[in-house]
Each structure stands twice: as C-alpha cells, then as structure tokens.
C-alpha cells in the first residue's frame, strides 16, 4: 500500500443523494476537502448505489485529478458473473465506469464459504492474478464476511493475496458471529495488511443511545464516530480504515482527528469498553445498512430503514419511530408484514441476519391492531 498517504479511506458507498441520484456538487466538495487534507484512498464497487458509485467517482474524482493523486479500489462481486468468461468484460466495464486504465486494488468481494466456491469454480482468483500480471491491477485482495476458519482457508489456498478488507469495530470485535478479532488475528498470522470496513457499523456507532453517548461526551475529545474510527485504526497491521461519508461535515470531522492520528489512550479505551457493554445490552438489530438486501426484494421493502426505526424505538421509545415507519419508509414501499419469506435478502446479507424473522418482529412492533 505504498501509494497511500494516510490511514483514512473514503468509501463511496453512502454518498449524499438528491432523490435517486448522487448529489455530485456536494460529493465534489467532499472529494476536494479529502484530497486537500492529504488523504488519497478511495473505495467503490459496482453494486454500490446501483452502479452510481462508480460513475460518481468518475465525475467527482478521476475526471478532475491526475491518476497519481489517488489510490483506487474496486471489487469483483458474485452477482455480476456466472462463468469465467464473464469476468474480463465486467472488469473492463468497471474501468470504463470509473474512467481509469487500472485499479490499485481489486478485491474479490464479500468472500464467504458460498461465494468462495463460486469464485473458485469460475477461476476468478486466477483471472485477477492475470490482470495483475498485465498491469491492469496493482494488488489483488479480498473483502471478507465469514468465520476466521474460512478466512484462514482462503489465505492458505491463495497466499499471493495482498490485502484483506474486514468488518472491524469495537462492537463486533468479540462478536461470535462477525468474529472481527479472530479474523484480524488470522490476517496477522498470514502477514496480510488489513483494510477496515464498517468502523462505525453503518453509522450505528455515530448515533449512540443517550447513556452510551454520555460516556464518550464526558471525555470532551471528539465525536462518537471519532472514537470508533480511532479504535479500529490503532491496531498493528491495520493499514487503512474506510469511512462511508455522507456529507461534507462528516469529511471535515474525520479529517480533524485523522490528519495527525493518535490511537486511543487507556482512558478512552475504558470508555469505549463501557459503550460496548451498553450497546450490547440494548438488543439492537446489527444491520449496517449496506442495502444489499433491497435490490432483489420482490416486495420493495426498505429493510435497512425499517430496522433503523426499530432500533430507534428500542433506544428512544418515542413517537418519532412510529411516524417514520408509517409516513416515510413504508409510504411508497413495502411494509414489514408484506414480506413473503422468499429468503433472497438473507442470501446476500453480509451480517448473516435472520431478516425474515426480524421483519416479523418489526411488523409486530409497528403494525399493531387497535
């Protein structure tokens, strides 16, 4: 990762929107501020924002700055190829969409036991290594959502992989499902640099319950998001921490505490541990709002938004959540009770959530009769 200047990356996944389209004017401001502060790592994938992430990146970054000014990561996602022959045309379409001739990093996206078998059957890894040999990719890596044992298997079978992107934050650190700590330890064993995704857990660690927020506020040292990102960035071998920034204020906040990065001190680590305990006591739905589930939903249910209002009601117990459920998130889309239990959402969820059962819980909470 020799071209990276600092250890904060810009994830092009949660960009500001104007209706269905990316707010390009604000995104340009965000990109300009990020680069001006000395940061240069950008991360995208074709599935982000239904393809709009790549085209926004071209409009806001690659068409406006020299290629040597930024490091660019893209990904090969299982949904977009069925055979080995599909991979190269898809890759070339990604280059065109992003407006570049090469990618600094090309990641085998969302590797899990199921996805890994598909990638192997289609010789996706071999194709990626060939693209590297041709100079179209500088580094080949993976992004990963599965057990530490599965990660160890992949890195053992493909030791030439150069980086691993992991979900890593203080709530998931010892979570038995996500296994952030154990996966991180596997990367250390294999000597692979780690790129962190979801350091703020889809925004959940920026919008803490009041009692948890009070613990961090008492430190008088920064935003809730700042402690989450600094927690992740403070581990040896973690070379990059991605933040899916949604407005200029978030960019400015991240720049302020990551420009001259300092790991959490003992007092801050103790506070984060207390927040971790409070957060876990709330029994919240651990959705990161990646929105992979919404694209194939036949009932057009805005699943992450319904989970967000469910969490909000558990935390705040006020009328706002009911209002947003009935008047905003289900006004033009499906209600939780509209779920036909087809299971498409669960097959693509990186968090392995039991979405169908959770939607039934949401319906029971918000669609009470009488």
Map each language-model feature to its residues:
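Conserved residues at the C-terminal ends of beta-strands
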Residues: 11, 45, 106-109, 143, ...
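Glycine/proline-rich, positively charged
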Residues: 18, 32, 81-200, 208-211, ...
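Structured C-terminal cap/extension of enzyme domains
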Residues: 32-35, 39-40, 59, 182-370
């Amino acid at each position: 990762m020799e071209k990276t200047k600092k250890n904060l990356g810009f994830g092009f996944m949660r960009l500001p929107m104007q209706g269905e389209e990316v707010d390009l004017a604000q995104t340009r401001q965000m990109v300009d501020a990020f680069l001006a502060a000395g940061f240069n790592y950008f991360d995208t994938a074709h599935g982000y924002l239904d393809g709009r992430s790549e085209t926004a990146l071209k409009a806001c970054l690659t068409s406006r700055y020299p290629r040597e000014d930024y490091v660019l990561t893209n990904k090969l996602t299982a949904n977009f190829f069925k055979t080995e022959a599909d991979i190269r045309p898809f890759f070339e379409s990604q280059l065109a969409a992003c407006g570049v001739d090469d990618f600094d990093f090309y990641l085998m996206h969302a590797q899990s036991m199921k996805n890994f078998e598909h990638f192997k059957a289609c010789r996706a890894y071999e194709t990626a290594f060939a693209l590297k040999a041709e100079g179209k990719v500088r580094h080949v890596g993976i992004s990963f959502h599965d057990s530490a044992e599965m990660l160890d298997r992949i890195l053992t079978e493909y030791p030439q992989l150069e980086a691993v992107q992991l979900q890593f934050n203080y709530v998931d650190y010892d979570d038995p499902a996500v296994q952030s700590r154990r996966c991180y330890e596997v990367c250390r064993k294999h000597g692979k640099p780690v790129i962190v995704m979801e350091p703020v857990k889809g925004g959940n660690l920026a919008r803490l319950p009041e009692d948890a927020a009070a613990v961090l506020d008492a430190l008088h040292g920064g935003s809730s998001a700042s402690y989450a990102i600094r927690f992740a960035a403070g581990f040896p071998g973690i070379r990059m921490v991605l933040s899916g920034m949604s407005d200029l204020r978030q960019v400015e906040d991240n720049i302020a505490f990551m420009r001259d990065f300092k790991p959490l001190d003992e007092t801050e680590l103790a506070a984060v541990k207390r927040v971790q305990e409070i957060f876990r006591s709330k029994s919240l739905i651990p959705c990161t709002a990646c929105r992979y589930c919404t694209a194939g939903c036949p009932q057009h249910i805005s699943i992450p938004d319904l989970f967000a209002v469910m969490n909000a009601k558990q935390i705040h117990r006020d009328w706002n959540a009911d209002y947003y459920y009935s008047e905003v998130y289900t006004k033009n889309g499906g209600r939780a009770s509209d779920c036909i239990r087809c299971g498409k959402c669960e097959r693509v969820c990186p968090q392995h959530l039991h979405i169908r059962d959770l939607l039934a819980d949401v319906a029971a909470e918000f669609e009470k009769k009488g």
